Amino acid sequence: EQRLNYARYVYFDKNGFIRVFSLLDKLGTFLNELLEIRTERIKSHFSYFTVLRTMRERGVHPELTVPLNKLKEGCKESTHRLRRRRNTEIHYMNSEMHDDLLQQTRMYGQEVLLENLDQQLQDLATGLHMAVQSIRLTFQYAERMLHRH
């Protein structure tokens, strides 16, 4: 039963953090088009974070940029860990392979550190909160833009 629970955790955790970044990437594309940021001129493949940084550097739409940036900064540590996990998962190896490799290469008798599941769940919850609140702020701003025109 413990293995089954862990297998479920791994499936839903991976699915969760990949989907959080998928939401953010789609939001970045939406913001880029809505606000005519043209991030693709700087970087052909860009993320939400690239669009937000470009908005901040250009000083455009401060009534949206400031709260989005504040939200991002408030979730910085968790988001950084999620990004590192996502990049490891996509570009190198998944966390189970990483754990297996560490266990095989450690010296006998040393304490083996495994994934911190509680931390990972908290990071995922924080990342989801940031994504949902960023979407909310963006759509509220878009609605105000539509009413002005």
Predicted features along the sequence, with ranges:
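Long, contiguous alpha-helical bundle segments
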Residues: 1, 22-25, 140
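Charged alpha-helical initiation segments
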Residues: 1-10
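Short, hydrophobic, well-ordered secondary-structure elements
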Residues: 9-35
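Acidic, Ser/Thr/Gly/Pro-rich intrinsically disordered interaction regions
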Residues: 10, 35, 39-149
